[in-house]
Amino acid sequence: MKTPGAADGASPARPGNVLCAGPARRERRRTMERLQQFTQLLCGSFDNAAQFRQMQAKGEASFPFARHVNTPCNEKIRGLPQGFDGVFVVEESYYTVNGRTHASPHLFLFTQQGENIKLTSYDLPQGCGKAGFTFETMGEVAFGDLSPSKKFTPAVYTCRGGVWEGGSTSMFTPALKFTLFERFSSEGLEVSETMEMNGKRTFGYDVPILYRRTEDTAQA
C-alpha cells in the first residue's frame, strides 16, 4: 500500500524537524553542559577564612568572616515547564563581624543566554521570610507561584580563559543603588557587593570577598 500523498518511487513523508533534530539536540546538550560547568563552580560551601585572617592581621576589624552556601533546588519546585533548562539555586550568605552574624538568603535562577549565563533573582517563596530561609527549610513550591524580583537587574556572566565574570547595577529605589560584580573559577568565588544611598556607600568593602571551597565540598 502506498503511503498517502507519496508519489510513485518517492520515499514516505517523514515527520517535520527530523533532519534538524540531531543538530538541535547536540546544541541543547552543549548548552546544558556549559550551564552545568558554571553551576558546578558556583555550588557548594565556601568561606573566606584565609582572607579573614589576613585582614584581621592588618587590623581590619570590620571586615567580615563570610560563609557562602549555594545549593541547586529544582527538585523542590513543582510544575517546571517541559524542556526547562534553567537551574534554581538557594544562596545562603552569612557575614560575621565582631561576633554578630547576619544571614542573607536569596533564590536565583541561572539560564543560558547565548554563550553567556544569566542570573535572575526571584522573590523568596510566599510565606518564607529572610530569617531562617535555607535550602533545608525550603518546602516544595509551585513554579507558577514564583516571581522574579522587580528590583534586581539580571546579571550576565561571560567566560574568559576559564573564569566567569559579570554582574549588574540595580536601583532598588531612586536613591538606593546596588552594584554586584563577581568572578567564578576553580580557584573559588570573588564577590563584590556595594549599596549606596544618595551616592554614599552604606554597605560593602574596599576589596572583594574571596571565597574558597571548604574541604567538605571539594570538587572531585
Each predicted region: which residue ranges?
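Soluble ligand-binding/transfer domains with enclosed cavities or grooves
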Residues: 42, 47-220
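Short, Lys/Arg-enriched N-terminal segments with co-localized hydrophobic residues
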Residues: 4, 19, 24-31
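N-terminal helix-cap/turn-to-beta initiation motif at the start of protein domains
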Residues: 31-45
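Short, charged low-complexity linear motifs
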Residues: 27-35, 189-190, 197
